[in-house]
Amino acid sequence: MSLTLIVVLVVVLALFFDFTNGFHDTANAMATPIATGALKPRPAVALAAALNLVGAFLSTAVAQTISGGLIRGEGDHVSITPPLVLAGLVGAITWNLLTWLWGVPSSSSHALFGGLIGATIVGTWDAGSIDYHVLLGKIVIPALLSPVVAGLVAYSSTKLAYFATRRRDGRADGRSGFRYGQIFSSSLVALSHGTNDAQKTMGVITLLLISAGLQPAGEAGPQWWVILACALAIATGTYTGGWRIIRTLGKGLTEVKPAQGFAAETSTAATILASSHLGFALSTTQVASGSVIGSGLGRSDGHVKWGTAGRIALGWLLTLPVAAIVGGATASIARLGTAGLIIDLVIAVVVIVIVFRINARRRVTSAHMTPHAEAEVADATVALEFTRPGDEAAAVASPAGSAGAADREARP
């Protein structure tokens, strides 16, 4: 298989990952305003898509962390090769699609890093091909600290918002004015998501071009066509709406009120924007989840569903190693040459087809997002359900837990 064809296939696969990142992470910006009724579902995701598109053009610091820092190299060469980039993307896409199907808000970013790390180590048989200082300083430590920081900021902001408006307690309109603020704050989250997450795919494609000798290693910044393609891919994915994960963040962790949602969104946006300028490739999903939990704790009459929170945390812990294992396995197959690459591509296509076919059997759409569309979710880490002709509905539980089978909405 020619190098040019491999590069084209990997670029297509990278843009598909960017697309999945869009619908997987739509919830980060729009789950809480949809939950409180500040925005209707379809206009919300359209707004998020437009702002993700704009945000992708605002910075390239995170892209350079991936293309010029994580994978070691010598001179104009890097340890990773185009087939290994393909293998890493298969690992990332596999975990991204599975967690989306299970309704678990896991990290698309860590799935990508895990896939690339596993593919590089197995493909080169050299654990030293990874720059662990960059891995720890720019990825792992921010991943551990960012949800805690965002949660503390959201907790404090929620307390402050309720204290400042305490005279409105008991009124019919209560704190509904915060719904207007949510439109602004959720827009800021969507913009910041574009500045952070779109860059990760830009970095992967740039890394691919460097590994193929099509771009000097000293020029780690993405080319203009890479920026444009990634911006369009993530915006398109965002517009499709990741309704399963929107439901988990909007309903499954805590009952979200307008003031609380506003505090969570502003905390999320502030954390993401600050990290983007510092080149930290953190997970916007973890930040958003931490903010929602913090805001739930900040409300005196609020509570957090710790069972759901625990399953989300388990998903966070599994993301990087599982994606690395899949990336490593596909990298070992890629070592077979052209036949190995074809097998890897077939694996990717099979995973994509199976996941979307299962999703089609029990779809979650924008119709399920309105406040009265369905009964409150007992545990929004949703099990998959499908009906076979003549059979009772069977539940296929996710690794995140089987309690979600209690949610049985009508097929749209």
List each language-model region with its residue ranges.
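Multi-pass alpha-helical transmembrane bundle typical of ion/small-solute transporters
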Residues: M1-P412
